[in-house]
Amino acid sequence: MDKIIKSISTSGSFRAYVLDCTETVRTAQEKHQTLSSSTVALGRTLIANQILAANQKGNSKVTVKVIGDSSFGHIISVADTKGNVKGYIQNTGVDIKKTATGEVLVGPFMGNGHFVVITDYATGQPYTSTTPLITGEIGEDFAYYLTESEQTPSAVGLNVLLDDEDKVKVAGGFMLQVLPGASDEEISRYEKRIQEMPSISSLLESENHIESLLSAIYGEDDYKRLSEDSLAFYCDCSKERFEAALLTLGTKELQAMKDEDKGVEITCQFCNQTYYFTEEDLEKIINDSIK
């Protein structure tokens, strides 16, 4: 089961989130049938979104839009405070071969664009914040967003590793943030440790990557675990929700779907689930719309 562990240094100067998102990203790959580069790009976005949502409380939802001008197109993800995330990538078929070190290229196929975060506090007034893409690798873009938009210096590592058949082998990451009151000496020590830590890929490949990530982040500094929560790919779409959307269409358009198309099918962008509305279904919706 996927999970996120929240921790804090004993000094109270740093906090870190570490995540195992393997099943989450594997489910996304299966639902969208993404090829290698698209899988990694979508997976990194889902991981970043789960970190952002873990910072929220109540019934808040966080939408992340990675908007590029290259092969991937847009990547859209939505996460809630209960550990659920869903998402999709416009171009599922980017399949660029791995580099000599086994890494899958992402940045060149994201291109120029923006990292957009929309936080819905369930009050009817969502808050939107936008920062430019720095590298298109998503992890660096996420760290830049945290530092620039949320004014919190952060180190981030996100990745998705694939097996020889380009299926998800492991996915996860971390976020480390400086908290108010951290001394210059502490900041320098953590900066040095992050600069010298093994690559996120090598840490994810270790037998227990959650423990490896925590050890790499904190080193000899003491820390305590604050919480451990489950994570999952989950889409809240339903036939009823799409029926409500159809109700917003005009009677003329609904009648055309019934008479000319003999029904309609709608596919959810976030999970690829398809819903079918027969002529009888549409007749009922038409009758409901004119009541």
From Swiss-Prot:
Disulfide bonds join 235-237, 268-271. Keywords: Chaperone, Cytoplasm, Disulfide bond, Redox-active center, Zinc. Under oxidizing conditions two disulfide bonds are formed involving the reactive cysteines. Under reducing conditions zinc is bound to the reactive cysteines and the protein is inactive. GO terms for biological process: protein refolding. GO terms for molecular function: protein folding chaperone; unfolded protein binding. One of its GO terms (cellular component) is cytoplasm. It is found in: Cytoplasm. Its main location: cytoplasm. HAMAP family: HslO (MF_00117). Redox regulated molecular chaperone. Protects both thermally unfolding and oxidatively damaged proteins from irreversible aggregation. Plays an important role in the bacterial defense system toward oxidative stress. Belongs to the HSP33 family. This is 33 kDa chaperonin. The lineage of its organism: Bacteria, Bacillati, Bacillota, Bacilli, Lactobacillales. The gene is hslO.
